[in-house]
Amino acid sequence: MQPKPPIAPKRDKTLRHRGVARVDPWFWLRDKDDPAVTAYLQAENAYTDAVMKPTEPLQEALYEEMRARIKEDDSSVPEKEGPYFYYHRYERGAQYPAYCRRHRALDAPEEIMLDINALAVGRSYLRVGVCDNSPDHRYLAYSLDLDGAEEYTLHILDLTTGELLPEHIARTYYSLVWAQNSQVFFYTVLDQHHRPLRVYRHRLGEDAAADVLVYEELDPRLFVSLARSDSGRFVYLYCHGNNMTEWRWLDRNHPQSDFTLIEPRRPEHEYDVTDHGTRFYIRTNIDGAKDFKVVSATIATPTSAQWQDFIAHRPGTLVTDLLAFEDHLVVSETIAGLPQIKIITLADGRSDYVRFDEETYHAYVTPGREFDTSTLRYVYTSMTTPEQTYDHDMVTGSRVLRKQEPVLGNFDRTNYRARRLSATGADGVGIPISLCYHRDTPLDGTAPLVLYGYGSYGHSIPASFSRLRLSYLDRGFIYAIAHVRGGMELGYHWYEDGKLLKKTNTFNDYISCAEHLVAKKFTAEGQILATGGSAGGMLLGTVANMRPQLFSAIIAHVPFVDVLNTMLD
């Protein structure tokens, strides 16, 4: 006998906003302290347990199978900075990393700077915010959140003595940048609404209560962050939010000086900055460059009136990031939904792309700690290829594999296939689909298929590898990603065409992808498991009502479905 699901009783609540009355029959479920709410949640949990009970042996088998693929004693690829190689590593059975370094050689004795596992003893929760060594390598600034509130307390460790300095700075956020003298650093602080809005300057050994407020953001729409420039010369202070940014810089050799504005904020103008020699290189959407272009200006006169095009706007080529080196500028782009890495030699303007061979993949640059190098580090992965970390020589074009993500067990990437398809949307637009499957899976419409979708905030979904996914690929499932509008896979217009009054494109695109996969015999109607989270949960709630017959099951993680109440909360 099948268990019956609990039904939440209706208790009408009238809400008024701008003269419009709305009736919400489930408003009462917001009250976490109401015993009736607790009872209802317990009933839902009991129902879930009852429905899933026959699958408990399979759940346990899947858990053990997935866990067995993880190499617990793993470490990051060391990064060179000055005389040290910095990295973090995990030990078998440990939940947190240890931050380590070696002096001058990778085979030198290991120095454990900070073992987070030791700090976590006796605590139910711990999360690291920043972990950044000083330029002279003597101090380590690190911050901890001990209760999940994302408010971090900042600590300073003297690496020569192993002792903590007396200062403990509360309510900080993720940003911290050291001055070049290793005696001063800048950090951000949260307000009561959890918005980072203030930047302070602190000198080691002084009372944090006397720290100097160097910037406060008064516009409640904007957040404040800090970054070290690629060259290491500057501290960047940037305000961001609501399709608007504003950047300032300060010389790290003169921490007592004021931050200098680069370009004043204005609505719908987004830009970010890197530096090289006497010039800034700026990624900007000014003058209608929706997919962004690259301009340059002298550091002495950086305002937009002085900007000169360095890479012109090319519709369909989304410029996503810049990274400067002593002799090169690296430009991250997305073209036709796939990431590209472009390397420009600044002396002569020659440009080359890093070559990738698979039909669908993901790749990204990892910013290093050194400016005066010809080595670019990037990560490559695909739906069938675990993450690979490469060092790419920007002069010769050669590359060295520094790390292959370990996948334990009997994993063999040649057992799997990855494809890139295009579905035709309801309005005739092509919708990209990335998918993977085991080579023995029949492509005759009999296979079950997992279809993931998101489509919001301009967030593009990468076609990357997952150890967990192997467990259902090995059982005959196909896994597919619907790159629907609302993301930015095909450029900024892809995002614009999936929001506000065009939000229905997101829903229609997902349905078009599902129908295409059925038509091409990858699966059949009623054999699709739809999945997504947060804004992707809103997508699933909508398509479940539009075309329920397409789906056998829907898994909506933390679904953003009570949109109006949430936004007005």
Where are these regions (language model features)?
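Serine-hydrolase catalytic core recognition
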Residues: 7, 76-79, 83, 263, ...
